[in-house]
Amino acid sequence: MATKNEEILRKPEWLKIKLNTNKSYTGLKKMMREHNLNTVCEEAKCPNIHECWGERKTATIMILGAICTRACRFCAVKTGLPNELDLNEPERVAESVRLMNLKHVVITAVARDDLKDGGAHVYAETIRKVREVNPYTTIEVLPSDMGGSIENWETLMAAKPDILNHNIETVRRLTPRVRARATYDRSLEVLRRSKELYPDIPTKSSLMVGLGETTEEIYEVMDDLRANDVDIMTIGQYLQPSRKHLKVQKYYTPLEFGKLRKVAMEKGFKHCQAGPMVRSSYHADEQVNEAAKEKHRLGELSSK
């Protein structure tokens, strides 16, 4: 029987979506299985999978295996002892992107704290292979903090993705509880370092809300990200993947998300997606286009 608190926090109507399993979605799913690829869309139970795979021709491919060495209390990805690295994965990912005719691909990975380089070399090689085979596909990467190693981060960034995305996930106060093996300041550091290494590559970060944070703490995250030159921010509703994960403390309304987006844009982000169903890679193709337009605009202004 549900508790009184669970009754109060029953999912509101705006979080109920109609699934659209069309031919594009079915084809992409089949392709993923044929090429033995993992996707965070499936592993993390993303609510937007049908829209992204079916309508937008974008996907988030998860490399370095399907088992994460961390056990963040918000995440549905399996945890435990990872498998051996698959050194053929970069070629397989590149060919799959070609066959799926993706306009934009997000390459993410499980945390591999068991590897000295955190998987950076395989990550970088995957970026290079995807670009070699798919020169017109934009590439976004969504790595872990790789233990905070600057050397590992430099290895990854040397492959020059079109967008670097690293998620802050939650506010400073809640970070130890939500993702115990990461730190708030380390995430800010890798975002700052990425921009220092390659100023022309847009940086991006995502925040979940509904874990017990205050509005003031959300604004603090925005300020911290902007202080480290982050260009793009996404804000979405935390949804509990299972009873073992953290409970939802609040469901934000679409109007509240609209206000958060307005504040984020006023604080200087070039682009912000905010909404109940928004996830880190939601409408990622739009974000890379907006970032490219802004880069072009600034280039024109500086030449005048």
Swiss-Prot record:
Its cofactor is [4Fe-4S] cluster. Its EC number is 2.8.1.8. Pfam families: LIAS_N (PF16881), Radical_SAM (PF04055). SUPFAM superfamilies: Radical SAM enzymes. It is an enzyme of class 2 (transferase). PROSITE patterns: RADICAL_SAM (PS51918). [4Fe-4S] cluster 2 binds at C68, C72, C75. One of its GO terms (molecular function) is metal ion binding. Residues 53-270 form the Radical SAM core domain. Binds 2 [4Fe-4S] clusters per subunit. One cluster is coordinated with 3 cysteines and an exchangeable S-adenosyl-L-methionine. PANTHER family: LIPOYL SYNTHASE, LIPOYL SYNTHASE, MITOCHONDRIAL. This is Lipoyl synthase. The gene is lipA.
